[in-house]
Amino acid sequence: MSVMIEAGALRKRYGDTQALDGVSFAAPAGTVLGVLGPNGAGKSTSVKILTTFADADSGTARVGGHDVHADRHAVRSIIGVTAQDATLDGLLTGRQNLEMMGELSGLSRAEARRRAVDLLERFELTDAADRMVKGYSGGMRRRLDLAASIVNRPPVLFLDEPTTGLDPTSRARMWDLLRELVRDGMTLLLTTQYLDEADQLADNIVVIDHGRVIAEGTPAELKRATGGLVLRVHVRDGVDAARSVVASFATGPVDVTVGRVLQASVAAEPGLATRLVRELDAAGVAVDDIELHRPSLDDVFFALTGERDSSTADDLDPELVYTEEAR
């Protein structure tokens, strides 16, 4: 399988900040590569270099076999880019936006019109085709922006936070559309703040932190590498006592969220739940619920970076959040 996106030992500095410090990854043709990391980790810088909007200080970057520095025009002719903020003209209709993008991409006027009709139908925007985009909902704007990015049928698509701000129904529809593009043979590089999105869509995942790749693999491989189980204890009261008990079982930090839920990674041992219940009871902790489950991608991300999925950040109570290293 040929490699469509390739970054090799990329380095980039902005002033005193080392944005990238030897980042390497690759995406085979017809696959989805998820690039994850905390804010400021280097995700966007990597995408800017690969899409020719920034130059690396050193390292190599190739898209579709073309060097992004030496052959910018060739790279730009085979990629589509969907940014976090939709790049649409709100005073034009959906149809006009697509026709304009088609002509800018080198299609004839007639070809651009035919392509616009096809995309409006495929992305379920036909009924709104002749309305000004400023009146579109967030989900409609996202779908139109995605349609605009593939108007010239690029084999490679870069998506930067494509579903940020969308409701669950609109996000699910976008996922379906992206899956359709991959089935058609397109290669996708996806940055996202939603770990469930990467879990659903990505064939392979790269985790970047402080400008370096700290983990890579399939979602299943990353979960297995985390090891053990994830313990969640919902307590009615006695958070401090519960923290001490959970820490004695944990293999890493104990995370406490709003609603008095304690979470930690634990080793998968026989009789774990029974011993935990016994010790919590002995400590006088009133427990509402105890959960044990295999690690999710959010658990992997937390184990690697110490940060939770930002889409669930509102669940954290700033007065209750703390970590305590396991005894």
What are these regions (language model features)?
Residues L125, G252-D255, A286-E291:
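A short linear hydrophobic-aromatic micro-motif
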Residues K12, F25, V233-V235, A264-V266, ...:
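Preference for bulky hydrophobic residues occupying beta-strand positions
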Residues V117, D176, A220, R224, ...:
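Solvent-exposed alpha-helical segments within well-ordered globular domains of core cellular machineries
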Residues G80, N97, G106, D145, ...:
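A generic structural signal for secondary-structure junctions
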Residues W175-A267:
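ABC transporter nucleotide-binding domain
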Residues V3-A7, K12-D209, I214-A215:
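ABC transporter nucleotide-binding domains
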Residues E269-R327:
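C-terminal coupling/interaction segments
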